[in-house]
From Swiss-Prot:
This is Nucleoside diphosphate kinase. Belongs to the NDK family. Homotetramer. It comes from the Bacteria. SMART domains: NDK (SM00562). It comes from Shewanella woodyi (strain ATCC 51908 / MS32). Its EC number is 2.7.4.6.
Length: 143
């Protein structure tokens, strides 16, 4: 199995509800290691840049407004098949469709405020990690 890195965001709704520790526990219990983490409050420009691929979609303005509404946690996770493992832990984008025991089923209220984001591919993960972290900020875990 391949050791991969993926990118994760705990969104403003979950941060506001003090779910950071519970969500980190889910990552670690699933065998994913947190190799970089920080809290940030995105500016409008940062949010628009991160979600640029959605700029022509009708929900873009609401997405940017939500993602700038409060602090977020951004983290880089590492582990076997990390991209898929992380997405499995998150559950379906719509929490109403998410399997019981997944992050979105347990911590999200709606499809618009769905608690977390996860990279959808290794290529996306590389781009998203680089958007928030320099190479020096990544701390591969050797123990």
């Amino acid at each position: 199995m391949a050791i991969e890195r993926t990118f994760s965001i705990i969104k403003p709704d979950a941060v506001a509800k003090n779910n950071i520790g519970a969500i980190y526990n889910r990552f670690e219990t699933a065998g994913l290691k947190i190799i970089a983490s920080k809290m940030v409050h995105l500016s409008k420009e940062q949010a628009e840049g991160f979600y640029a691929e959605h700029s022509e979609r009708p929900f873009f303005g609401a997405l940017v407004a939500f993602m700038t509404s409060g602090p977020i946690m951004v983290q880089t996770l590492e582990g076997e098949n990390a991209v898929l493992a992380h997405r499995d832990i998150l559950g379906a984008t719509n929490p109403a469709e998410a399997a019981p025991g997944t992050i979105r089923a347990d911590f999200a209220e709606s499809i618009d405020e769905n608690a977390a984001h996860g990279s959808d591919s290794v290529a996306s993960a590389e781009r998203e990690v680089a958007y928030f972290f320099s190479a020096e900020e990544l701390c591969p875990r050797t123990r």
